[in-house]
Amino acid sequence: MSNFSEVFARAQKTIPGGVNSPVRAFKAVGGEPVFIDHAKGAYVYDIHGKRYVDYVLSWGPMLLGHGDDDVLDAVRAKLDKGLSFGAPTEIETELAEKICNIMPGMDKVRFVNSGTEATMSAIRLARGYTGRDKIVKFEGCYHGHSDSLLIKAGSGALTLGVPSSPGVPACLAEHTITLTYNNIEQVRQLFRDRGNEIACIIVEPVAGNMNCIPPEPGFLQALREVCTQADALLIFDEVMTGFRLGLSGAQGYYQVQPDITTLGKVIGGGMPVGAFGGSERIMDFIAPVGPVYQAGTLSGNPVAMAAGLKTLEKISAEGFYQPIFDKTAALCRNLESAAKEAGIGFTTNYVGSMWGGFFTEEEKISNYQQVMACNTERFNRFFHGMLDEGVYLAPASYEAGFMSVSHSDEDIDFTVNAARKVFANIK
């Protein structure tokens, strides 16, 4: 059987960098990527058969865990009828109805193929609806790889050591205003000065691409207020937080209603999908009923819709979320205790089923500057140590971790015991 080095070398001959998304290449942590063969429940298995407790969960979608039998059955049933038709299907409406019934203030939703498509389309819609060009985002927040949003982006763009990407025209960058996440006064000052130029604010309600940074009290409410006063739109990028902080996402959790919401990940049950939605008044600006154009050959793919619909049906069950939230909290508390026993500066943030760990002496991490000051070298050693112990974390210190309903108390104990060993070795 080929080792990882051989498989990676082969991949690099035909795939740029050997991967189809940069963070997978392990550039941030060093070494060569683990190649996965299959997954089930809370575990992924590499091509050599080694099992890992998985806290990446395909970067968030697998809230039910990998290979949920009911989701797989729903997918198989759709597969027997064909893969794609390029025509409307009834299941698109069923999933749309389900999402609109769940998400506050969402009357209509448009399906696309990825989170990037969702945010890109939401920005275009906001500009078309308001007749304004400028958009506001926050330093370290990642909203996909469309040109307008790769300005001081988080996630993979941070691990590459650059705040944006070559190939983004300066004229687009000029229309993107970047502020500090969790800085309310900075937002208010901008809107006092230039509010009538701004089409929208786009924000991750919980920033999950500079690790896991929850909003400070009042921050999201302040965004809602300034947008309302300036007739700008507030976009919540809930590609990551959607259905992970509860059934109604971050907007339900924090009781702040955006004008447009972008979704992805969980709504496809692991299949490629994205969506954006809002009030009927705003969404009717989208073609074919409105002037703002958006289209996609594979949008609303029936197989992806089947996976998403079954996933949402299952997570809508009463009492579904609390056990996951409890396990997330227990994991974070116990990791902090293990680090303290080892004399290592380490703190965690968690909200719902999202979590993150920071190697720092600070007690609280709440913005991009603090994240960038954390000890990434120590994280890299921790990552590889945990990998050796059979725990799969995101291969970059700027990524959130995730919990699923499939993770057991034994998995949490296994993870914490592994961390104790690793903490002792990286002092």
UniProtKB/Swiss-Prot annotation:
Record localization: Cytoplasm
Catalytic activity: (S)-4-amino-5-oxopentanoate = 5-aminolevulinate
EC number: 5.4.3.8
Keywords for this protein: Cytoplasm, Isomerase, Porphyrin biosynthesis, Pyridoxal phosphate
Enzyme class, UniProt record, top EC level: isomerase
Cofactor: pyridoxal 5'-phosphate
Major subcellular location class: cytoplasm
One of the Pfam families matching this protein, by short name: Aminotran_3
InterPro entries: 4pyrrol_synth_GluAld_NH2Trfase (IPR004639), Aminotrans_3 (IPR005814), Aminotrans_3_PPA_site (IPR049704), PyrdxlP-dep_Trfase (IPR015424), PyrdxlP-dep_Trfase_major (IPR015421), PyrdxlP-dep_Trfase_small (IPR015422)
Modification N6-(pyridoxal phosphate)lysine occurs at: 265
UniProt-listed Gene3D superfamilies: Aspartate Aminotransferase, domain 1, Type I PLP-dependent aspartate aminotransferase-like (Major domain)
GO function terms (MF aspect): glutamate-1-semialdehyde 2,1-aminomutase activity; pyridoxal phosphate binding; transaminase activity
Pathway: Porphyrin-containing compound metabolism; protoporphyrin-IX biosynthesis; 5-aminolevulinate from L-glutamyl-tRNA(Glu): step 2/2
Disulfide cross-links: none
Domain of life: Bacteria
Cytoplasm found in the keyword field: yes
Cellular component aspect of the GO annotation: cytoplasm
GO BP terms, alphabetized: protoporphyrinogen IX biosynthetic process
Subunit: Homodimer.
Family that this chain belongs to: Belongs to the class-III pyridoxal-phosphate-dependent aminotransferase family. HemL subfamily.
Protein name, per record: Glutamate-1-semialdehyde 2,1-aminomutase
Organism: Teredinibacter turnerae (strain ATCC 39867 / T7901)
Gene that this polypeptide is encoded by: hemL
